[in-house]
Design a protein with these regions (language model features):
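Acyl-thioester C-C bond-transforming condensing/cleaving domain
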Residues: 9-19, 27-132
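Short, conserved beta-strand segments within well-ordered enzyme catalytic domains
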Residues: 1, 24-28
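Conserved FAD-binding subdomain of flavin-dependent enzymes
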Residues: 1-10
């Protein structure tokens, strides 16, 4: 959220004068809510086997929450989705945003990315890939 706020401020747009149906958000995520997934699975495994998951499990886990929250905060109503393509996610978000503007589907796009899969599963998985 902070990175998107700073990008919007740095762009110098006067958002109140723009058509918010023509402003979109595309945000990259390498994996998504890995910490949420890991915690829910560990809590389930430690229990009695009864499937008890947090009702916010899915919304906290899916990568589309980030662009959705950015749009909600600023009232943007244009294209909105996340790209999930590992280490290329943010680059893909930038390319997609450029193309949305080029073909006329939006006038302004907020784009970027974020990731922090610093969990047991994330570190072990990347270690197994010899990517650390």
């Amino acid at each position: 959220m902070v990175a998107s706020d700073e990008a919007i401020d740095d762009a110098g747009f006067h958002l109140e004068s723009l058509d918010k149906t023509r402003i979109g958000v595309i945000w990259g995520a390498g994996i998504g809510g890995l910490e949420t997934f890991q915690n829910e699975v560990l809590n389930f495994a430690a229990g009695d086997g009864t499937p008890r998951f947090n009702p916010f499990f899915i919304p906290k886990m899916i990568p589309d929450i980030a662009p959705g929250m950015i749009s909600i905060k600023h009232g943007f109503q244009g294209p909105n989705f996340a790209t999930v393509s590992a280490c290329a996610s943010s680059a893909n978000a930038l390319i997609d945003a450029l193309n949305y503007i080029r073909v006329g589907h939006a006038d302004v796009m907020v784009c970027g990315g974020s990731e922090a899969c610093i969990t047991i599963a994330g570190v072990a998985g990347f270690n197994a890939l010899h990517a650390l």
